[in-house]
From Swiss-Prot:
Residues 72-79, 146-164, 243-262, 316-335 are cytoplasmic. It is found in: Cell membrane. It is a multi-pass membrane protein. InterPro entries: GPCR_Rhodpsn (IPR000276), GPCR_Rhodpsn_7TM (IPR017452), Olfact_rcpt (IPR000725). SUPFAM superfamilies: Family A G protein-coupled receptor-like. Odorant receptor. This is Olfactory receptor 9K2. Glycans are attached at residues 30, 114. Keywords: Cell membrane, Disulfide bond, G-protein coupled receptor, Glycoprotein, Membrane, Olfaction, Receptor, Sensory transduction, Transducer, Transmembrane, Transmembrane helix. GO terms for molecular function: G protein-coupled receptor activity; odorant binding; olfactory receptor activity. It comes from Homo sapiens. Residues 1-50, 101-124, 186-222, 284-296 are extracellular. Disulfide bonds join 122-214. GO terms for cellular component: plasma membrane.
Length: 335
């Protein structure tokens, strides 16, 4: 018995010292007792915070202007009352919403010394962002299918892409996003957090939160990987197959005007898909030992994509340009 006591004390003391040194004022390893997290943000010199704040402010202003403007144009112009613009309006709403989940808090943290976020706030941020980013992936797949029907079966377009089907596709996208978000959020916050409260990111994301856990992450990562495959593979397959048929059909069109019209809408959609999926793949394939690269990728799909989407669709789409001009003329902005 005497020989076993030192071994017991040697086991207990490092754990206690680790709790004190890494957890600070939290003083517990139980996630249910945790009251907040600290968003570490970017590892830059303090004097660069003002520059980052101005950059985030500019991007967020562009997101608000572009996406609110796009939704307003689509709702006010009868010529844009088509399935494609119904999907585009929902895409603008999603971009506006999920950027608003992240950016305001990130901008506040550039100025505030208190960079904490409440436990409930962190849960809400992860849940909403996961819901909306997955919904956007399914919505982009629905938009690819819409382009496939419009180009490959134009005579049946109004019949096949009915209002009911469009509503079902959008509702299904939100439903899939909600189910995925519930699973991801519940898995993340049932972990035991026994490391620092500091989340090495500018918002609450699942991977940085996993780094704070002392639980066995094998099963968690396997479920996350399976969930990602279930989400990403079907959407990518729908997009790729749709565009294979689209390209095959467009190549059979002999008129130059037909080529331009087909590629103008398709190239806009492909640009949005490329930016979003490219950033997502880059972020999740980046090893954990390079957290700064992961943050850069997160910036692409959380800030850059919502800013670029309205620009991509407006610059490459004559219908949107004409609707915007008509809207501005009504408001007497253009003399």
């Amino acid at each position: 018995m005497l020989g076993s006591k030192p071994r017991v004390h040697l086991y207990i003391l490092p754990c206690a010292s680790q709790q004190v040194s890494t957890m600070g004022d939290r003083g517990t390893s139980n996630h249910s007792e945790m009251t907040d997290f600290i968003l570490a943000g970017f590892r830059v010199r303090p004097e660069l915070h003002i520059l980052l704040f101005l950059l985030f402010l500019f991007v967020y202003a562009m997101i608000l202007l572009g996406n609110v403007g796009m939704m307003t144009i689509i709702m006010t112009d009868p010529r844009l009352n088509t399935p494609m613009y119904f999907f585009l309006g929902n895409l603008s709403f999603i971009d506006l919403f999920y950027s608003s989940v992240i950016e305001p808090k990130a901008m506040i943290n550039f100025w505030s010394e208190n960079k904490s976020i409440s436990f409930a706030g962190c849960v809400a941020q992860l849940f909403l962002f996961a819901l909306l980013i997955v919904t956007e992936g399914f919505l982009l797949a629905a938009m690819a299918y819409d382009r496939f029907i419009a180009i490959c079966n134009p005579l049946l377009y109004s019949v096949q892409m009915s209002t009911r089907l469009c509503t079902q596709l959008v509702a299904g996208s939100y439903f899939c996003g909600c189910i995925s978000s519930v699973i991801q959020t519940s898995m993340t916050f049932t972990l035991s957090f026994c490391a620092s409260r500091a989340v090495d990111h500018f918002y609450c994301d699942s991977r940085p939160l996993q780094r704070l856990s002392c639980s066995d992450l094998f099963i968690h990562r396997m479920i996350s990987f399976s969930l990602s495959c279930i989400i990403i593979l079907p959407t990518i397959i729908v997009i790729i197959v749709s565009y294979m048929y689209i390209v095959s059909t467009v190549l059979k069109i002999h008129s130059t005007e037909g080529h331009k019209k087909a590629f103008s809408t398709c190239s806009s959609h492909l640009g949005v898909v490329s930016v979003l999926y490219g950033a997502v793949f880059f972020m999740y394939l980046t090893p954990d030992r390079f957290p700064e690269l992961s943050k850069v990728a997160s910036l692409c799909y959380s800030l850059v994509t919502p800013m670029l989407n309205p620009l991509i669709y407006s610059l490459r789409n004559k219908d949107v340009q004409e609707a915007l001009k008509k809207f501005l003329e009504k408001k007497n902005i253009i003399l």
